[in-house]
Regions:
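Short helix-to-turn junction characteristic of helix-turn-helix DNA-binding domains
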Residues: 27-31, 70
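Basic, Lys/Arg-enriched C-terminal extension of HTH/homeodomain DNA-binding domains
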Residues: 8, 13, 52-78
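The N-cap/first-turn positions of alpha helices
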Residues: 19-23
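Regulatory hinge/linker segments at domain boundaries
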Residues: 1-18
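Recognition helix of helix-turn-helix DNA-binding domains
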Residues: 30-65
Length: 78
């Protein structure tokens, strides 16, 4: 379980905004995009836009790749 993901690591490593880092954290925790949007209190379209931005900043193109990248980053930098 990755609920103790420190979003500051994601912000620092990938230059994510706080909102993007929170979305990435929920996705890494196993939530889907709709669940993550609901948890964050944002519209699905907002979450999709943030996800596209996260993909651009991290260089990945799929949620599964993003989760893998986040988990590897946490192992490396925690």
């Amino acid at each position: 379980k990755t609920s103790d993901i420190d979003i500051r690591i994601l912000i620092s490593l990938y230059k994510l905004t706080r909102a993007e880092a929170m979305l990435a954290k929920y996705l890494a925790d196993g939530a889907n995009l709709d669940q993550s949007a609901a948890q964050l209190g944002i519209a699905r379209n907002t979450a999709r836009a943030q996800l596209r931005s996260i993909f651009a900043k991290t260089g990945v193109s799929q949620q599964s790749m993003l989760v893998s990248l986040i988990l590897k980053s946490l192992v490396t930098f925690s």
